[in-house]
């Protein structure tokens, strides 16, 4: 089955795995998805991720993070810019998610980065998703 929006598919797989309390989730690999996984790990939303090389395609295996009482650290994921409606933002308008408790992920001319990193580097870009 072909996927029209691979990033939305990644976010949906993570959301479903969190709701089902799975330890890991497998996602078909791409450079953009790897960059998003690196940001999620750096910001503390996931425990770890590995890339498994495969014959038809490689996959990213994400180890999800839970609190001591087995509640998922990721409580919400939202795709913002979609293939049918791209959303771009200037540096001054980079959104704060949940009053600073969440994270916005942007695709900028300097690569994929978190919203606060883009603000520090004084660049805007396409708002890929929100995580909280």
Swiss-Prot record:
Gene3D superfamilies: 3.30.1370.30, 3.30.1490.10. One of the primary rRNA binding proteins, it binds directly to 16S rRNA central domain where it helps coordinate assembly of the platform of the 30S subunit. GO terms for biological process: translation. Belongs to the universal ribosomal protein uS8 family. Part of the 30S ribosomal subunit. Contacts proteins S5 and S12. It holds the Pfam family Ribosomal_S8. One of its GO terms (molecular function) is rRNA binding. Keywords: Ribonucleoprotein, Ribosomal protein, RNA-binding, rRNA-binding. It comes from the Bacteria. InterPro entries: Ribosomal_uS8, Ribosomal_uS8_sf. This is Small ribosomal subunit protein uS8. GO terms for cellular component: ribonucleoprotein complex; ribosome.
């Amino acid at each position: 089955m072909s996927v029209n929006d691979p990033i939305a598919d990644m976010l949906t797989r993570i959301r479903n795995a969190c709701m089902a309390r799975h330890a890991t989730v497998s996602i078909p690999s791409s450079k953009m998805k790897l960059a998003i996984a690196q940001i999620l790990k750096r910001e503390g939303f996931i425990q770890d991720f590995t890339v498994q090389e495969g014959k038809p395609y490689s996959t990213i295996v994400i180890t999800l993070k839970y609190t001591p009482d087995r509640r998922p650290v990721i409580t919400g994921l939202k795709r913002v810019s979609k293939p049918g409606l791209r959303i771009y933002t200037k540096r001054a308008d980079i959104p704060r998610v949940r009053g600073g408790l969440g994270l916005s992920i942007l695709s900028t001319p300097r690569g994929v980065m978190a919203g606060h990193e883009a603000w520090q580097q004084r660049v805007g870009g396409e708002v890929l998703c929100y995580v909280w």
